[in-house]
Amino acid sequence: MTAAKIKVLCVDDSALIRSLMTEIINSQPDMEVVGTAPDPLVAREMIKQLNPDVLTLDVEMPRMDGLDFLERLMRLRPMPVLMVSSLTERGSEITMRALELGAVDFVTKPKLGIRDGLMEYTDTIADKIRAASRARVRQAPQAASGTPATPMLRSPLLSTEKLIILGASTGGTEAIKDFLMPLPPDSPAVLIVQHMPAGFTRSFAQRLDGLCRITVKEAEHGERVLPGYAYIAPGDSHLRLARSGANYVAHLSQEAPVNRHRPSVDVLFDSAAEHGGKNVIGVILTGMGKDGAKGMLRMREAGAYNLAQDESTCIVFGMPKEAIAAGGVHEVVPLHSMTQRVMARLATYGTRAQRV
């Protein structure tokens, strides 16, 4: 008996995009488009009639804004939503907000040659729909009504040599925010790979920088890695930890994708194993696939202490599951306890710098 196909509803004001998404999705053996809608008002009725497993949603549409629709949907009928975004600064900012509101992930429309560009994305779109269909959906956050502020964690007396090295993918934008917000201003440096296209990582970093006590920025090639900063790998660039004399520096490159990703978590983790060794705390959060599993094992073998997000708090328990299976993880921790566990672990290292 064959498994039921994933039912997808595509919502986009462009007839061309609706047609291409239908072509891409229906070419896969395990999914089908059960309907298309030109705007959210039509989509609302189709959701009731068709009960889709996954919704693809354009971020900018007439009649009702995609974000307004998403916010209502996640409040009234939470379901897996994959945003379809334009490669523009405005598109990236709206997409970041959509992920905050509960969208599982996003795909980008190419700027030119939409037909060829989208068809090239076939595997990516199909993989993201599969992941979305299995994702644990977050409801839209309620408006702040006396919700407690994120507790301020105090930094133990630390050597500036300590580093937090983090990788994430699907669901990672919100998980990274939840991890970074409690960090104290004098936290060890954090190097981050989140699978995301060029342009979107800048919006992501800016949004986090406005929320966190540490400084959050896109990593720049050759810059010194300092405590109190989080460095996010720019989309379409690998990020490595490197040494320049006694200092840690960020190294960016355009080398071939690894595990189909650039930036790749394995690339960052491998460099941390080589140059950070025992000074590293490794963290792997929610994400699809196995990027980071081999690198986390190498970090462990080099003396790092590694933590993985647990299944119950992951949007997609792919990357943490693979890292655990590979043997690279010391502790499996729910997201809401992750920052505290990392800081507690750092406190056990004491004050003495550990040179590698």
UniProtKB/Swiss-Prot annotation:
Residues modified to 4-aspartylphosphate: 58
Post-translational modification: Phosphorylated by CheA. Phosphorylation of the N-terminal regulatory domain activates the methylesterase activity.
Domain Response regulatory intervals: 7-124
Molecular function GO labels: phosphorelay response regulator activity; protein-glutamate methylesterase activity; protein-glutamine glutaminase activity
Keywords on record: Chemotaxis, Cytoplasm, Hydrolase, Phosphoprotein
Annotated active site: 169, 195, 291
EC nos: 3.1.1.61, 3.5.1.44
Catalytic activity: [protein]-L-glutamate 5-O-methyl ester + H2O = L-glutamyl-[protein] + methanol + H(+); L-glutaminyl-[protein] + H2O = L-glutamyl-[protein] + NH4(+)
GO BP annotation list: chemotaxis
Subcellular location: Cytoplasm
InterPro entries: CheB-like, CheB_C, CheY-like_superfamily, Sig_transdc_resp-reg_Me-estase, Sig_transdc_resp-reg_receiver
CDD domains reported in the protein's UniProt record: CheB_Rec (cd16432), REC_CheB-like (cd17541)
Domain CheB-type methylesterase: 157-349
CC terms in the record's Gene Ontology section: cytoplasm
Principal location: cytoplasm
PANTHER family given in the database record: PROTEIN-GLUTAMATE METHYLESTERASE/PROTEIN-GLUTAMINE GLUTAMINASE (PTHR42872), PROTEIN-GLUTAMATE METHYLESTERASE_PROTEIN-GLUTAMINE GLUTAMINASE (PTHR42872:SF6)
Function, in words: Involved in chemotaxis. Part of a chemotaxis signal transduction system that modulates chemotaxis in response to various stimuli. Catalyzes the demethylation of specific methylglutamate residues introduced into the chemoreceptors (methyl-accepting chemotaxis proteins or MCP) by CheR. Also mediates the irreversible deamidation of specific glutamine residues to glutamic acid.
Matches recorded under HAMAP family: CheB_chemtxs (MF_00099)
Family: Belongs to the CheB family.
Domain topic, free-text comment: Contains a C-terminal catalytic domain, and an N-terminal region which modulates catalytic activity.
Protein name per the record: Protein-glutamate methylesterase/protein-glutamine glutaminase 2
Taxonomic lineage of the native organism: Bacteria, Pseudomonadati, Pseudomonadota, Betaproteobacteria, Burkholderiales
